[in-house]
C-alpha cells in the first residue's frame, strides 16, 4: 500500500488549501486587532505606528500556533464540505474507498501539519515573541529592558537588575539587584526570593533578602533579613512590556523552568500545565480534523457552508473553554496537570470516533 495514493493526495490538497486560507484569515484578523491595540501605546519613547506594525509582524508566529487548532477544524470542515457538496465523497465510497480510509487520508494530511505546529511552537514562536517584546522595550525605554528565555535584565539608574520570573501583574521571583557607584564599581548585591508591588507607596515589598556589601574591597560583609523594600522606577506596567508569559516559552524552556522551581521547593503547577498543553497541542490539530470529518459524514452532510462555519466556530469555542477550565481545575484540586492538558483533546477524540463509527 502506498503511503499517499491518488485519493490521499487529492483529499490532502483540498484540506490543506482550506486550512491555510482559514489560518491566514484568523491570523490577519488577530493581527489587525493587535495592531490597533499597539497604536494606543504609540508615542511612548520612539514607539510609533511603524513600531506597532513591526511588533505585530513579530507576533505572527505565536498567533499561528494559537489559531492552528481552530483553523484545522474550520478548514477541514470547509474542505470536506466542498467534497461532500460535489458528491466526491460519495463517489469515493462507491468506488470502494471506505469511510475509515477517508479518515486515514485526513490523518495523513494532519501529520505534516502536526509537525509544523510543533516546530513553530518550539522554535519560531518563542523567539518571535521575545524579539517583539525586546523591540518594543527598546523603542519605549531605549534599551533599559532586555528579555531572555531565562529571565529579564533591567537598568535602573546606576543599578542593574536581574529578575528570574514575573509572576502575575504585581509579583516577581528571584530578584538580584547589582548596585554600582558613579565610577561603575560594584557596591552591593542584594537578592530577594520574591517581591510584591505596593501600589499605595509605589515600592516593592521584598521577602527573604540576602545582601552583600562590597564597598570595602578587603572585606565583604553580608546580612540576611526576612523582608525589605525596594524603591525603583521599574513598575509592573514597565516590566510587563518585556516580560515573557509562560505561553511564550518553548517546551524545553518550560521543562527547564519546572525543574528549577521544583529544585528550589516552589510550586511549578502552572508551568507544568503550560508545558503539557504545548506538548499536546499538536494532538489537538489532528483531533479537530477528525472532528470535522465526523461532522461531514454525520449531521453536517448536506447543510449550507455557513452552517458548517458556525458549527465549527461553536465547537472550537467549546474546546477552548474546556481547555481553559480543566487546566486550572487540576491545579486547584491537586490533579496531575497532564490530565488537565490531555482531557479536552481525549474527549473530543472519543466523540469523533463515536460519530464516525456509529453508522459505519
From Swiss-Prot:
It comes from Escherichia coli (strain K12). Component of the lipopolysaccharide transport and assembly complex. The LptBFG transporter is composed of two ATP-binding proteins (LptB) and two transmembrane proteins (LptF and LptG). This is Lipopolysaccharide export system permease protein LptG. Residues 1-14, 85-103, 300-314, 358-360 are cytoplasmic. The gene is lptG. The chain crosses the membrane at residues 15-35, 64-84, 104-124, 279-299, 315-335, 337-357. Residues 36-63, 125-278, 336 are periplasmic. Part of the ABC transporter complex LptBFG involved in the translocation of lipopolysaccharide (LPS) from the inner membrane to the outer membrane. PANTHER family: LIPOPOLYSACCHARIDE EXPORT SYSTEM PERMEASE PROTEIN LPTG, SLR0882 PROTEIN-RELATED.
Amino acid at each position: 500500500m502506498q503511503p499517499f495514493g491518488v485519493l490521499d493526495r487529492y483529499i490532502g490538497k483540498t484540506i490543506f488549501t482550506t486550512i491555510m486560507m482559514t489560518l491566514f484569515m484568523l491570523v490577519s484578523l488577530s493581527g489587525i486587532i493587535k495592531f490597533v491595540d499597539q497604536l494606543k501605546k504609540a508615542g511612548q519613547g520612539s514607539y510609533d505606528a511603524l513600531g506597532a506594525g513591526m511588533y505585530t509582524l513579530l507576533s505572527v508566529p505565536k498567533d499561528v500556533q494559537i489559531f492552528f487548532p481552530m483553523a484545522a477544524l474550520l478548514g477541514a470542515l470547509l474542505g470536506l464540505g466542498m467534497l461532500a457538496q460535489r458528491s466526491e465523497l460519495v463517489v469515493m465510497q462507491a468506488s470502494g474507498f471506505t469511510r475509515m480510509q477517508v479518515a486515514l487520508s485526513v490523518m495523513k494530511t494532519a501529520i505534516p501539519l502536526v509537525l509544523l505546529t510543533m516546530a513553530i511552537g518550539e522554535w519560531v514562536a518563542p523567539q518571535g515573541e521575545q524579539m517583539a517584546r525586546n523591540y518594543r522595550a527598546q523603542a519605549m525605554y531605549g534599551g533599559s529592558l532586555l528579555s531572555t528565555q531565562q529571565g529579564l535584565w533591567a537598568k535602573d539608574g546606576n543599578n542593574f537588575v536581574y529578575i528570574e520570573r514575573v509572576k502575575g501583574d504585581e509579583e516577581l521571583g528571584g530578584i538580584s539587584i547589582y548596585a554600582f557607584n558613579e565610577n561603575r564599581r560594584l557596591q552591593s548585591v542584594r537578592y530577594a526570593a520574591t517581591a510584591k508591588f505596593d501600589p499605595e507607596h509605589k515600592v516593592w515589598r521584598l521577602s527573604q533578602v540576602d545582601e552583600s556589601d562590597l564597598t570595602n574591597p578587603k572585606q565583604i560583609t553580608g546580612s540576611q533579613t526576612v523582608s525589605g523594600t525596594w524603591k525603583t522606577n521599574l513598575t509592573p506596567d514597565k516590566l510587563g512590556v518585556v516580560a515573557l508569559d509562560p505561553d511564550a516559552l518553548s517546551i524545553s524552556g518550560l521543562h527547564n523552568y519546572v525543574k528549577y522551581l521544583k529544585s528550589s521547593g516552589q510550586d511549578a503547577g502552572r508551568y507544568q500545565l503550560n508545558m503539557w498543553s504545548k506538548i499536546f497541542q499538536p494532538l489537538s490539530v489532528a483531533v479537530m480534523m477528525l472532528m470535522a470529518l465526523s461532522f461531514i459524514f454525520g449531521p453536517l452532510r448536506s447543510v449550507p457552508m455557513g452552517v458548517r462555519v458556525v458549527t465549527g466556530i461553536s465547537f472550537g469555542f467549546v474546546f477552548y473553554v474546556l481547555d481553559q477550565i480543566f487546566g486550572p481545575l487540576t491545579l486547584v484540586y491537586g490533579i496531575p496537570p497532564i490530565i488537565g492538558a490531555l482531557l479536552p483533546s481525549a474527549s473530543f477524540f472519543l466523540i469523533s470516533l463515536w460519530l464516525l463509527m456509529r453508522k459505519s
